[in-house]
């Protein structure tokens, strides 16, 4: 019987590969693709009568909402093992929902199960209180957490046995909700296969007796490593056999079969989500920017690659774990450092993509194993992300925006399936990520450079350059009243002798006070002005009286939570 199943899986996998090839080229990116997990809050459950301690977690999530909002996250999951162990109070549910929505994001709410500690009536009561009594109209709901780990369930029958009654009870209260499951701790193929066998004994994708679909989104978690990974493993993992790329291709074949068999289409079509994800669930004790864990630069690039593969395969949303947690380097796996509030490379990679990837996914191919590339495209722009994960190699690169072979001797050749007959040449530094934005004709209009040695070590975000026409960097006109949002339009002259002007893309009509800083290439602060007025959007800087040497410097401008950076070259 086991051999028969293996043959069936092999045939299905071959079929889904064909399905994927036909699907990739025009794969829309979900409008709520970029997600996070609401972890770690201060308290979950009744602290005075905690069922399974601890209920008091001492988390500082309430201080991080501005960071989460500014990262570009759009969908936030309130769930995980803590929510499953100790049912949140009504106040905690509502406070979390209101905090998420106050920052322009949409909540995903988990009801607890904890191996029958909680029942379907309690789940229905939670839906009733939140959606009916409180009028919060939460769309996405999750049942339980990691049944194959937390409950040690190893059979689909065990999971279907609680998913179905919970889903029916919840949808009887509010038929408009969408339910997510089974929330496997990893891509547990055997369990997921049985749960997605149309009309099989454990199928959770069909309808109950009241005509309600049980599950609307098939979900799983992924933490590929445990902290012992090598750099080579990190670079090759996601597209290796049996890893994320293969798993999503296989899952798409299951979902397609369920949609066909159950007549699910349009808004009722079954979808997929990854509701917890990170490079590892714990770091090596020595992990830092130069390591290979959640605090490392390549860890941020790993996040970007996970998002690219997920977009390519039509994942509706991916929620990374987590915002901020951990009191030591092993448990510090959030995208904001819980101790220092420093934004990690994972934060900036997430933000780069969340702010710039729109429309359809665009596939990319490269001729270097240590370089990955992919992008997005809408009617106005094509975004191309290049991840150079090589430790030492700087590459002369040619990017072509279609699949025509690239001539010449460039060390790095990248073809993007964007159907634009245009090429662009650039030097891609080692251990760096570069995002290029082209207009509909294939002309470069924006560039974001984020590298280990120039940005991450200085704890600054990507260096931004905006292009206009053929004469270099030009300012872009924008409304005067845009709150704290701004861009650095240009720095001139550049190169310079230490005297230069920073020009923003808008006039400072509200007389806001900006912070302007200049760092050397080693990340040391060499100049700071805390109340830069930017009269008419311009600020003159004179470093000729400072003891600075010729070289490359980073200019950073801050206003509230908005931070923009760019490079200058000083020649004395």
Segments predicted by a language model, with ranges:
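Noncatalytic carbohydrate-binding groove/subsite architecture in carbohydrate-active enzymes
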Residues: 123, 156-298, 313
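N-terminal catalytic cores of secreted or lumenal carbohydrate-active enzymes
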Residues: 27-216
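Carbohydrate-binding surface patches
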Residues: 367-406, 431
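Bacterial N-terminal signal peptides
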Residues: 10-20
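Beta-strand-rich binding/interaction modules
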Residues: 392-418, 512-518
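Aromatic/acidic polysaccharide-binding cleft in carbohydrate-active enzymes
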Residues: 274, 279-353, 357, 361-371
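C-terminal outer-membrane/trafficking sorting elements
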Residues: 477-492, 496-572
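C-terminal beta-strand-rich structural cap/linker in extracellular carbohydrate-active enzymes
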Residues: 423-471, 551
């Amino acid at each position: 019987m086991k051999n028969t199943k293996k043959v069936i899986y092999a045939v299905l996998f071959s079929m889904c590969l064909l399905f994927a090839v036909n699907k990739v080229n025009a794969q829309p990116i979900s409008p709520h693709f970029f997600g996070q997990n609401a972890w770690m809050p201060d308290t979950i459950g009744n602290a005075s009568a905690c069922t399974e301690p601890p209920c008091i977690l001492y988390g500082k999530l309430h201080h991080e909402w501005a960071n989460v909002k500014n990262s570009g996250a759009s969908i936030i999951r309130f769930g995980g093992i803590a929510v499953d162990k100790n049912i949140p109070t009504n106040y905690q549910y509502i406070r979390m929902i209101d905090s998420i929505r106050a920052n322009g994001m949409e909540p995903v709410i988990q009801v607890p199960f904890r191996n029958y500690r909680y029942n379907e009536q309690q789940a229905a009561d939670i839906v009733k209180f939140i959606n009916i009594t409180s009028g919060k109209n939460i769309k996405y709901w999750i049942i339980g957490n990691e049944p194959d780990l937390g409950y040690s369930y190893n059979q689909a029958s065990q999971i279907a046995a609680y998913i179905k009654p919970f889903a029916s009870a919840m949808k009887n209260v509010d038929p408009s909700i969408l339910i997510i499951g089974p929330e496997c701790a990893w891509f547990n193929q055997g369990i997921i296969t049985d749960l997605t066998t149309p009309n099989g004994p454990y199928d959770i994708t069909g309808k109950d007796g009241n005509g309600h679909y049980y599950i609307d989104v098939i979900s799983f978690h992924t933490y590929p490593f445990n902290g012992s990974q090598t750099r080579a493993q990190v670079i090759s993992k996601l597209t290796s056999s049996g890893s994320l790329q293969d798993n999503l291709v296989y899952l798409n074949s299951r979902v397609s079969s369920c949609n066909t068999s159950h007549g699910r289409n349009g808004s009722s079509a079954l979808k997929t989500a990854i509701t917890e994800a990170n490079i590892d669930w714990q770091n090596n004790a020595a992990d830092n920017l130069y390591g290979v864990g959640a605090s490392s630069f390549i860890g941020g690039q790993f996040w970007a690659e996970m998002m690219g593969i997920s977009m390519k395969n039509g994942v509706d949303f991916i929620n990374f774990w987590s915002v901020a947690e951990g009191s030591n380097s092993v448990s510090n796996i959030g995208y904001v450092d819980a101790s220092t509030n420093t934004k990690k490379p994972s934060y900036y990679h997430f933000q780069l993509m969340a702010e710039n990837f729109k429309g359809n996914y665009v596939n990319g191919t490269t001729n270097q194993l240590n370089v990955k590339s992919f992008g997005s495209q809408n009617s106005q722009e094509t975004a191309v992300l290049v991840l150079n994960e090589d430790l030492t190699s700087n590459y002369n690169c040619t990017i072509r925006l279609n699949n025509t072979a690239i001539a010449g001797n460039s060390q790095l050749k990248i073809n993007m399936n964007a159907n634009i007959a245009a090429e662009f040449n650039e030097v891609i530094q080692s251990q760096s990520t570069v995002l290029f934005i082209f207009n509909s004709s294939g002309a470069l209009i924006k560039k974001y450079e984020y590298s280990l040695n120039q940005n991450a070590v200085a704890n600054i975000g990507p260096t931004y350059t905006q292009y206009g026409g053929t004469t270099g960097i030009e300012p872009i006109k924008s409304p005067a009243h845009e709150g704290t949002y701004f861009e650095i339009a240009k720095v001139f002259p550049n190169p310079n002798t230490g005297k230069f002007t920073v020009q923003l893309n808008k006039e400072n009509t509200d007389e806001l006070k900006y912070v302007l800083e200049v760092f050397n290439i080693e990340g040391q602060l060499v100049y700071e002005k805390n109340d830069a007025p930017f009269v008419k959007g311009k600020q003159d800087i004179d470093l000729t009286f400072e003891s600075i040497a010729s070289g490359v410097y980073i200019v950073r401008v801050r206003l509230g939570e908005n931070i923009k950076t760019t490079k200058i070259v000083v020649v004395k």
